[in-house]
A protein has these predicted regions:
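FIC/Doc superfamily catalytic core
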Residues: 1-206
Length: 206
């Protein structure tokens, strides 16, 4: 079983450039309250734009598309999904909304990841939602001649629940030790994608 040790790996990330960037980010975050209240309408507008762009990009990378008008209506929850693609987009919209509105109350734990994945597919009727992968998967590519080759071999299906528990534990241990979340999150996301825990929807979940 792979080992996940964020507290040790974090030390290698503390380059002068990264430390400088972290300092600036936290400095600007401390100043943002000066701009939030007088610009609340503009910030709300920017948030809606960000949701639309995130939904479009995250779904398109997995080949899930619809027209621009339909996408905007779906993200704004002003229409019902008609096709399978639109049902998956609507599920992503709801998961994104859940995270935006409740992120402070969503712990990084296996059962919560499964719940969010189930919500991702709640409009589709597909049985893959809310379950870890049942078969091994690979990250493969096909060259111009049609030859398929394996780029990456994720964790095997039978090891997946334990691997996810381990990365969640590593994340929480590092967070409880006071390590900056901006350092922990990219390590967690990379490990999540390397585990590739679901039969479908790994990119959108990350």
């Amino acid at each position: 079983m792979r080992q996940f040790e964020y507290k040790e790996r974090m030390k290698r990330l503390l380059t002068p450039n990264i430390v400088s960037l972290l300092t600036k980010i936290h400095e600007y975050k401390g100043e943002q309250n000066l701009f939030i209240e007088p610009n609340s309408d503009k910030l709300t507008e920017l948030l809606e734009i960000a949701k639309i762009q995130s939904t479009e990009a995250s779904n398109k990378i997995e080949g899930i598309c619809t027209s621009d008008d339909r996408l905007k209506q779906l993200v704004m929850d002003k229409t019902m999904p008609k096709t399978r693609n639109e049902k998956e987009i609507a599920g992503y919209r709801d998961v994104l909304t859940t995270i935006h509105e409740n992120y402070e109350y969503i712990p990084i734990r296996s059962n919560y990841l499964l719940q969010l994945h189930g919500d991702l597919y709640k409009f589709t009727g597909l049985s893959v939602g809310g379950k870890y992968k049942s078969v091994d998967n690979v990250i493969a590519e096909i060259d111009v001649n049609g030859n398929k080759s394996i780029r990456f071999q994720p964790v095997e299906a039978w090891q997946t629940p334990e691997a996810i528990n381990n990365i969640c534990e590593a994340y929480n241990d590092a967070l409880n030790d006071g390590i900056d979340p901006l350092l922990i999150m990219p390590m967690f996301i990379l490990d999540f994608l390397c585990v590739h825990p679901f039969n479908d929807g790994n990119g959108r979940m990350s």
